Amino acid sequence: MFSSLFGVISNDIAIDLGTANTLIYQKGKGIVLNEPSVVALRNVGGRKVVHAVGIEAKQMLGRTPGHMEAIRPMRDGVIADFEVAEEMIKYFIRKVHNRKGFVNPKVIVCVPSGATAVERRAINDSCLNAGARRVGLIDEPMAAAIGAGLPIHEPTGSMVVDIGGGTTEVAVLSLSGIVYSRSVRVGGDKMDEAIISYMRRHHNLLIGETTAERIKKEIGTARAPADGEGLSIDVKGRDLMQGVPREVRISEKQAADALAEPVGQIVEAVKVALEATPPELASDIADKGIMLTGGGALLRGLDAEIRDHTGLPVTVADDPLSCVALGCGKVLEHPKWMKGVLESTLA
């Protein structure tokens, strides 16, 4: 059944429909699209129409005039705005194929392991309405583990921690199945929110998402630097007291303080998962360690922070941002894998 569903060489694609970014893997070609999951809408006669999607739309975040808005249709790894998400998926699928009259693709989509039946159905229906012929769903930690090269088909335990924009997925896998999974709604977005809140509280400075993301990427760290303040960057925003633009300097230590809460939640999720892991699989994980994937895995010092709190070796995947999409793509390329990883989630 599964080989007949995705086995033919065609336009078949795998989609990592992330809160922050959407990646598309096309069968036989690899990753062909990586764009922000952002849509800009324009008000025309009381009706909202799509103005821009992806990279162009993200550049408009926080900068739109009154008759326009830039929004993220995905929140916490699931669809928050059904109609807008559908338009976004449709746009990306058409951009990938870039020609008229193509055969509608069969699609594999990643979903958070903690997604409800209603949330899974929303993703399934959005893809169908966007032009997919049939849709298969795969849990994100399974896709991340495959993309990171973990031996998920073997009778041995593997642990993956996938830190995305909206959620962190912690899972223990063995024999093509998920033995334990925990999905916590903390990820890159919560880190950005924590930085925005810190700047407001400690500097009376209002900054936007784009500036917060820049702070996270340039000096963000899971632990304060040993030599004091560490690197510093200048940040511009609006003074909350005077209402005028102002510039302040923020250090690595301050960034670590700002990120302490979301980092702590990720570490706690890992510890809870380890406590719930069966003894034999826990022994395997003690030998092989924990694999970090997702954009959040790039936060400096996060691997060391998890290692210090668990006593286990922690490895960041070679290409953490692409692991989920690559894992989906591997399933797409090798139909014999499908029964093991899609059977429980096929919609």
From Swiss-Prot:
Q: What happens when the gene is disrupted?
A: Depletion results in lemon-shaped cells that possess defects in the integrity of the cell wall.
What protein am I looking at?
Answer: Cell shape-determining protein MreB
The UniProt record lists the keyword Cytoplasm: yes
Q: Which GO terms describe its biological process?
A: cell morphogenesis; regulation of cell shape
Q: Which cysteines are joined by disulfide bonds?
A: none
Q: Indicate the quaternary assembly.
A: Forms polymers in the presence of ATP. Forms pairs of protofilaments that adopt an antiparallel arrangement and bind to lipids.
Q: Which family, according to UniProt? A: Belongs to the FtsA/MreB family.
Lineage of the native species? Bacteria, Pseudomonadati, Pseudomonadota, Alphaproteobacteria, Caulobacterales
Keyword Nucleotide-binding annotated: yes
* Function description: Forms membrane-associated dynamic filaments that are essential for cell shape determination. Acts by regulating cell wall synthesis and cell elongation, and thus cell shape. A feedback loop between cell geometry and MreB localization may maintain elongated cell shape by targeting cell wall growth to regions of negative cell wall curvature. Required for mid-cell peptidoglycan synthesis and cell division. Directs the localization of the cytosolic peptidoglycan precursor-synthesizing enzyme MurG. Also required for proper chromosome segregation.
Q: Which InterPro entries match?
A: ATPase_NBD, MreB, MreB_MamK-like
Q: Mind naming one GO cellular-component term on file for this protein?
A: cytoplasm
User: What's one Pfam family the UniProt record gives for this protein?
Assistant: MreB_Mbl
